């Protein structure tokens, strides 16, 4: 059976271009080996802490179990799952495309990326639709139970989307680089462009179109409502700033990656590009991946830390936990002091008992 080997980038969906193009040039390899692992490590640390804090705060607060928070927690969980795979990819890049973690880890890390690509953008889209309904149609029914059902459906779709990754991703020796890479090995050449175009459409174009539509209508609704303009100007400014941030962050983080993978799919379908274009795509792919992955670290700040509700809940949680921690600390200090006094008394008592009664030798 004919097979098509994807070896240009472990996380992208490109094939190696023409032999005349030095796709993995020494310059590209050096900056990938040195800079990409640093970016991945930074994204992992920032995103892991941020998403863990989001999950802890919202799960601890039973009073704020809303539709929006349901999607926020699931979004944070999706980002957190993917971020757990970033250290593996960082090591992979630092070792020059040499995968040392085995076949199972290769498949699982690839699957976590695929899950995040779809789950993350679907949860962001659901949040956009929920905000649209809350502002434009405030009397419409929005239940937490319904949001949980939608979240389960999103997770199922995201997991199902990993079937091609689990089937085709595997370790494969690359003799020209003298490494064992974690790559996609397709049954034939049509699999790669078809899966890439599906990812471009379902994972970017449609969600971005829905988000842009929702937020443009929210903006028009707020600006066209006299009561909001007269009494809630600050609220309008805050919402509009959030709208712009949401749309721009998603677009800027993932647009470059999807454009580059789209060009790769077109090339595989027979569209001819110059050698310089192929080299540019190969050089920019790791950078575009860093941008896309940074969305997982930005999300907690974008959706939570700039919002009043999250800050209020974080402060409330701190106020609830701080007295308990203080009490525990005081209790431990008291016990230690008591223990020290008792130990001192025991030592003094033992010394007195051992002294000769005449006070001398």
Segments the model singles out, each with a brief description of its role:
Residues 40, 44, 57, 82-96, ...:
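Helix-to-loop junction signature of class
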Residues 17-27, 99-114, 137, 143, ...:
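Loop architecture of class A 7-transmembrane GPCRs
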Residues 32-59, 212:
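First transmembrane helix
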């Amino acid at each position: 059976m004919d097979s098509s080997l994807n070896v240009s980038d472990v996380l992208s969906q490109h094939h190696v271009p023409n032999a005349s193009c030095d796709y993995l040039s020494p310059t590209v390899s050096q900056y990938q080996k040195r800079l990409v692992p640093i970016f991945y490590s930074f994204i992992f640390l920032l995103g892991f802490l941020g998403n863990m804090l989001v999950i802890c705060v919202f799960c601890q607060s039973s009073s704020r179990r809303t539709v929006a928070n349901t999607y926020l927690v699931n979004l944070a969980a999706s980002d957190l799952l993917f971020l757990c795979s970033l250290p593996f990819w960082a090591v992979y890049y630092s070792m020059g495309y040499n995968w040392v973690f085995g076949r199972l880890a290769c498949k699982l890390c690839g699957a976590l990326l695929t899950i995040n690509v779809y789950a993350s953008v679907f949860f962001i889209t659901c949040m956009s639709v929920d905000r649209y309904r809350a502002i434009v149609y405030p009397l419409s029914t929005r239940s937490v139970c319904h949001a949980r059902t939608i979240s389960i459906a999103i997770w199922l779709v995201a997991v199902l989307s990993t079937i091609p990754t689990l089937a085709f991703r595997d370790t494969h020796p690359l003799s020209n680089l003298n490494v064992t890479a974690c790559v996609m090995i397709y049954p034939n050449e049509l699999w790669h462009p078809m899966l890439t175009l599906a990812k471009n459409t379902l994972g970017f174009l449609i969600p971005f179109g829905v988000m842009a539509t929702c937020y443009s209508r929210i903006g028009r609704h707020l600006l066209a409502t006299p009561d909001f303009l007269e009494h809630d100007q600050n609220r309008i400014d805050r919402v509009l700033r959030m709208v712009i941030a949401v749309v721009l962050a998603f677009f800027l983080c993932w647009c470059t990656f999807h454009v580059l993978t789209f060009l790769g799919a077109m090339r595989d379908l027979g569209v001819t590009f110059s050698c310089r274009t192929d080299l540019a795509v190969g050089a920019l792919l790791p950078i575009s991946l860093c941008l896309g992955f940074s969305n997982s670290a930005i999300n907690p700040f974008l959706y939570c830390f700039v919002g009043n509700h999250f800050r209020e809940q974080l402060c409330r949680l701190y106020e609830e936990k701080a007295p308990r921690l203080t009490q525990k600390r005081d209790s431990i200090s008291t016990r230690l002091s008591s223990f020290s006094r008792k130990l001192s008394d025991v030592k003094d008592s033992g010394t007195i008992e051992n002294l000769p009664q005449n006070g001398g030798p």
